[in-house]
């Protein structure tokens, strides 16, 4: 049957012999409180235009809404440890989120510099003490060449602090202009990112990336992709009930999916009273 067939992946040759470091994980994260507007990715609202390496965040006024702060992340780590989750995804940990979207900005993130209220060493140590890990987040703002320039250093930082998985993101129009999320240039980029991640023993969960085509057989560290509407859409206008029943016969034929399950309350006003996108 179609569901039992592995034809899509069988045509690929495996490139990783020792896969003992690769395994799916269950994770929780701070993203939901951000996307609903309860909190922010950005550390401050004082800086309309960030210059990485120049902007002094210590001299700015914190907004008080930054979700990726030490105390909040520890709460998520405690929750993960108590309820059997493997990892905690922390978005908004790194500098640059103040003007990340909609500005066609090339040098938007450096993927290695944390905000002042995110102690990367202490939080990773705390997670290990609790028997869980932090999951890295690399939002690129679709500034792809910038990501590639920093990719080796970004993966090196992950190795240094004990991260073994990254959720990457490609929100917005691709830079350089003229390239598209599903074009050949971007397909080459996704492959490059996954291959380099394998060198560093890092699993990749890519969001806004091209629909998988069986490549996870060759590079099984491509542990999951988004590439379809996940659970969050149930709170953003909803999807038709048939959607989930079709996924095994369509999207999932190409490889595993990060469906972002576990969102149980679709009334987002409970998190943010000003948001009524039930």
What is the predicted function of each stretch?
Residues 2-4, 8, 12:
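Single conserved hydrophobic/aromatic residue that forms the stacking wall/gate
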Residues 14-16:
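GHKL-family ATPase ATP-binding module
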Residues 18, 29, 38, 52-71, ...:
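Pre-Walker A segment
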Residues 23:
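Phosphate/adenylate-binding glycine loop and adjacent helical scaffold
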Residues 28, 80, 127:
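Conserved hydrophobic/aromatic pocket- or pore-lining residues that grip, position, or stack substrates
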Residues 34-45, 53-72, 137-150:
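Active-site mouth loops of central-metabolism enzymes
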Residues 72-93, 160-164:
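Catalytic domains of carbohydrate-active enzymes, especially glycoside hydrolases
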Residues 91-276:
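Aromatic- and carboxylate-enriched substrate-binding clefts and catalytic-loop regions
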